[in-house]
C-alpha cells in the first residue's frame, strides 16, 4: 500500500456522491495525504442524490480518516479562479505534491452525430475538458517547478481518448487532446522530477452514467431503462465482465501518486476491464 503521509493532493471534480473524484480523494486520504477537493459548486447539483452533500461531505469523510481536507469551489475554466484554488491549497497546507485533474463536462447536447452537433455544445466540452485541465496543470506545474521538490500530475482522460465512438465526437476529441497534453507535459516537466500520466477509464458506474443515459435515450425508452441497458451491454462486452467502479480508478491513481511510479511518465493507462487493451 502506498504511503502518502506528508503529501498534499488537489483533486478537481470531487463533489459527486459516487464520483471518481470522491473515490480518489478518499483513497489518497486513506494513504495519509492531505486533500484539497474541488468542484464548481459546493452542494450537489439538483439532480444528484439527496444523500450527497457535495464537497462538505467529502471533507467530513476525509477528516474521519484522520487526514486533512478542505473544500475549494472554483470554475476550472477560469484562469483567475484556478490560481486562487492553487493559492488556497498552498496557503492551507504549504505545498501541492499531487494534482488529479478529474473535472470534466457533463454529458448533454454534445451526444449527437457530427452533422447534428451544435457549435456551442462542441465548445463547452472543449472548454471544460481541455482548457480546464490545461489551466489546472499549468497553475500546479508552476508551483511544483518553483518549489523544486518534484510532483505527480494525473490527468483523467478516457478510453474515448484512444478510439472514436459514434455520437461522442466532441468528447472523444477532448479526451484525445488530454493524452497529447499528458505527453507534452511529461517531456517538459521531466527535468523537474514531475511525473505526468493519464488514466483512461472505460464506463464507470457513477452519476455520470445517469447524465449519459438521459442524453442518449431512444424514443420510447426511459433514462432508467437506457442506463440499465448501457451497464448491461458494456459489462457483456468487457472481458472482465463488469463496468468499473470509482474504486478501480482510485486504485490506479493512488499508484501514480506514489513513489512507486517514479519511473513512469507520459503513459496513458486504460482502466477498462479489457475493453481497450491498447
Locations of regions flagged by a protein language model:
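Residue(s) in the substrate-gating loop at a strand-loop-helix junction
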Residues: 158
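Canonical Rossmann dinucleotide-binding motif of NAD(H)/NADP(H)-dependent dehydrogenases/reductases
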Residues: 2-37
Amino acid at each position: 500500500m502506498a504511503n502518502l503521509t506528508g503529501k498534499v493532493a488537489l483533486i478537481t471534480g470531487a463533489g459527486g456522491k459516487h464520483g471518481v473524484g470522491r473515490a480518489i480523494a478518499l483513497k489518497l486520504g486513506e494513504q495519509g495525504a492531505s486533500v484539497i477537493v474541488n468542484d464548481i459548486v459546493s452542494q450537489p447539483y439538483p439532480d444528484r442524490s439527496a444523500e450527497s452533500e457535495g464537497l462538505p461531505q467529502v471533507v467530513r469523510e476525509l477528516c474521519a480518516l484522520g487526514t486533512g481536507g478542505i473544500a475549494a469551489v472554483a470554475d476550472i475554466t477560469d484562469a483567475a479562479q484556478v490560481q486562487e484554488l492553487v493559492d488556497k491549497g498552498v496557503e492551507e497546507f504549504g505545498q501541492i505534491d499531487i494534482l488529479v485533474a478529474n473535472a470534466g463536462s457533463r454529458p448533454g447536447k454534445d451526444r449527437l452525430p457530427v452533422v447534428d452537433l451544435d457549435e456551442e455544445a462542441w465548445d463547452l466540452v472543449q472548454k471544460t475538458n481541455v482548457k480546464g485541465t490545461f489551466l489546472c496543470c499549468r497553475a500546479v506545474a508552476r508551483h511544483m517547478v518553483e518549489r523544486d521538490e518534484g510532483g505527480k500530475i494525473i490527468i483523467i482522460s478516457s478510453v474515448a481518448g484512444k478510439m472514436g465512438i459514434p455520437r461522442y465526437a466532441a468528447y472523444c476529441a477532448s479526451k484525445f487532446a488530454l493524452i497529447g497534453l499528458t505527453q507534452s507535459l511529461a517531456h517538459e516537466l521531466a527535468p523537474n522530477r514531475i511525473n505526468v500520466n493519464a488514466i483512461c477509464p472505460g464506463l464507470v458506474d457513477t452519476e455520470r452514467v445517469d447524465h449519459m443515459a438521459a442524453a442518449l435515450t431512444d424514443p420510447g425508452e426511459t433514462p432508467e431503462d437506457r442506463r440499465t441497458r448501457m451497464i448491461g451491454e458494456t459489462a457483456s462486452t468487457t472481458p472482465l465482465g463488469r463496468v468499473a467502479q470509482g474504486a478501480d480508478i482510485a486504485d490506479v491513481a493512488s499508484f501514480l501518486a506514489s513513489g512507486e511510479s517514479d519511473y513512469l511518465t507520459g503513459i496513458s493507462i486504460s482502466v477498462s476491464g479489457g475493453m481497450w487493451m491498447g
